[in-house]
Design a protein with these regions (language model features):
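Extreme N-terminal basic, low-complexity initiation segments
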Residues: 2-13
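C-terminal lobe/tail of nucleotide-utilizing enzymes
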Residues: 28-30, 35-46, 227, 231, ...
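Pre-Walker A (Motif I) flank of P-loop NTPase domains
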Residues: 48-52
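Conserved beta-strand segments of the P-loop GTPase G domain that flank and frequently precede/overlap
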Residues: 54-55, 83-85, 189, 235-239, ...
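Walker A/P-loop NTP-binding active-site region of P-loop NTPases
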Residues: 55, 60-120, 200-203
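Conserved nucleotide-binding/hydrolysis micro-motifs of P-loop NTPases
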Residues: 87-90, 122-126, 192-195, 240-244, ...
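Phosphate/Mg2+-binding loops and adjacent switch elements
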Residues: 138-242, 247-250
Length: 358
């Protein structure tokens, strides 16, 4: 039987399955293999921001990554709010179930030690804005009972995004009596790549119409938060395949155009590559001599993943890392990925008292 020595063991081509151990995934920073300390720096830097926006195309594991980031941060002692921005505010919440939140609505609920959950709501943001702007709460309640006003807020260009932004801003403003932030870190699961851009672009149309006054001030404050790399970071999620990486690289340019700070990129479901360059070359010679084997597809997938990682490294100027492909789903998958992220923090001390500037 043909065999090649790889990473200290014999690998038989016919037995390559593409499955991997979660402990074997590579953390890469700017295209090179990184040590655990590098991973610690990347995650610690993310967790010191006030808002982390997780974006990506559908089906790449964005929601699972959002949950895993929040769970890992909470277990590292960082109070974290996991926020869901859903286009269907009344529908079921997959994210709430992944972290054990008992309800999914505009009210913040506890989901575990150091972990809270909320579903951002445009109507809730509108209500908060009116309460802040009008001289009495009853005036805001009366205004929201107006069907005409509600229809305008629901249909007006950029007004939905303004409501979502204002609720997020209100949550980030909250402080304890001693001045500490109630939510020093908020991880936001965006429903699609376009929503990250919409949060930054559509409110500009409001500013062009109302540059001053309470509306203009609120929108400007929200944009200042989203575009400040010290307080906000975008994490792009993709898969190690040609098309998803191409879409991600296109989004990198769009984020730059609207001023949203990209902080990291994640290649999800990375297959394990057990081969060194030398053993891979030896295997290719064997395949050329003896023809295809049952592991041919898995080898081709490894090559696609390698090329995808190289393309991503060449196309982004921020740290990126791989998350392993696991035979798990739901809460079990989130738990294992959170453990994987936590392993990158070994040897790095978190300082919960240090926070980004407001």
């Amino acid at each position: 039987m043909l065999g090649v020595r790889a990473a200290g063991r014999t690998v038989v081509p016919g037995r390559i399955t593409g499955r991997l151990s979660w402990r074997a995934s590579l953390l890469t920073v700017k295209g090179r293999a990184a040590c655990a300390e590098d991973g610690s720096v990347v995650l610690d830097s993310l967790w010191r921001r006030r808002a982390v926006l997780v974006s990506g195309k559908g089906g790449v594991g964005k929601t699972t990554l959002s949950a895993a980031l929040a769970v890992a941060a909470a277990r590292a002692g960082r109070p974290v709010l996991l926020a869901e921005l859903s286009p269907d505010e009344g529908g079921p919440s997959a994210l709430a179930g992944l972290v054990g939140a008992n309800e999914a609505g505009p009210r913040v609920v506890a989901a575990g030690p150091n972990l809270s959950f909320v579903r951002l709501s445009a109507p809730e943001g509108h209500r908060l804005f009116l309460e802040e702007t009008l001289p009495a709460k009853w005036l805001a309640d009366a205004a929201l009972r107006s069907k005409a006003l509600r229809r305008f807020l629901e249909a007006g260009p950029a007004l939905k995004e303004m409501g979502l932004m204002f609720q997020l801003l209100s949550l980030l403003r909250r402080k304890h009596a001693d001045g500490r932030w109630v939510h020093p870190l908020t991880v936001v699961d965006l429903p699609a790549t376009g929503h990250a851009l919409a949060l930054a672009t559509l409110p500009r149309s409001i500013l062009s119409l109302m540059p001053g006054g309470p509306v203009g001030r609120a929108v400007r404050e929200g944009l200042d938060l989203l575009q400040d790399p010290a307080r906000t970071g975008v994490v792009l999620t993709t898969l190690p395949e040609p098309l998803p990486v191409s879409e991600t690289l296109a989004l990198v340019g769009e984020l730059k155009d609207v001023g949203l700070p990209l902080s990291a990129a994640v290649l999800n479901r990375m297959p394990e590559d057990p081969f060194t360059p030398e053993s891979r070359a030896a295997l290719e010679r064997l395949l050329e001599t003896h023809g295809p084997h049952r592991g041919q597809r898995a080898l081709e997938r490894l090559e696609r993943a390698r090329q995808a990682r190289q393309r991503l490294a060449a196309g982004v100027a921020v740290p990126h890392w791989g998350l392993p492909e696991l035979a798990l789903t739901g809460v079990a998958l989130v738990e294992r990925l959170a453990e994987h992220l936590m392993s990158k923090l070994e040897g790095a001390a978190l300082h919960p008292g240090q926070e980004a500037t407001p």
